[in-house]
Regions:
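Long, low-complexity, charged/polar intrinsically disordered regions in eukaryotic proteins
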Residues: 1-20
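Short, cationic-aromatic polyanion-contact patches
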Residues: 16-32, 46, 79-105
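Residues within the helices of the helix-turn-helix
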Residues: 37, 47-48, 66
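Short acidic, hydrophobic short linear motifs in intrinsically disordered regions
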Residues: 42-53
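Glycine-centered, phosphate/nucleic-acid-interacting loop/turn motifs that mediate DNA/RNA or nucleotide
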Residues: 43, 72, 78
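Short amphipathic alpha-helical interaction segments
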Residues: 55-70, 76
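Amphipathic alpha-helical dimerization/coiled-coil segments
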Residues: 97-161
């Protein structure tokens, strides 16, 4: 396998072991991946829509949604809706920033709008840039080393494309 034969996604994971374990359990499951793929990236996704839109049992769906909330992939809330004379409470979920990154990781690239790709790459780069600065400060590494690497890779890519 060559250096260019790698998956070009880098995803941050939480520090807490329990949250990482929950995320891995979601990503290793067909139920978890299906639910993530069916989440709205911007806006609420209602629990009832996930139950109607998949072939999995209510119990499995609710269990995986709870795992995702515990892992900080999703935030949840309740909404009261009036239908006729009845008031019904419905549960909704929205992806956190971390959740959006995992959803985008699972989606085919052609389904992701270019402006969302740009925004997401900026967010992830910001997280890694702040981590690199912290590591450089803690270990006495010159930050210019990383600037040079980025400039070299950009130059190599530009030369290759011309």
């Amino acid at each position: 396998m060559g250096d260019n034969d790698i998956w070009h996604y880098i995803l941050p994971f939480p520090f807490e072991n329990e949250k990482r374990r929950l995320i891995w359990s979601v990503l290793q499951s067909k139920v978890g991946k299906t639910l993530l793929m069916n989440m709205n990236l911007d806006g609420r996704t209602y629990q009832r829509d996930l139950i109607k839109g998949t072939s999995y049992s209510n119990k499995s769906i609710i269990e995986y949604l709870k795992r995702m909330v515990s892992a900080d992939i999703l935030e949840q809330g309740m909404e009261q809706v009036t239908t006729g004379k009845r008031k019904v409470r419905i549960k909704w979920y929205v992806p956190t920033k971390l959740g959006r990154w995992f959803i985008l990781f699972l989606k085919p690239t052609e389904e992701i709008p270019p402006d969302l790709v740009r925004k997401t790459i900026e967010e992830i780069f910001q997280v890694y840039a702040s981590s690199i600065v912290e590591v450089c400060e803690n270990f006495g590494i010159d930050i210019d080393l990383f600037r040079k690497i980025l400039n070299k890779e950009y130059s190599n890519k530009t030369i290759t494309e011309t």
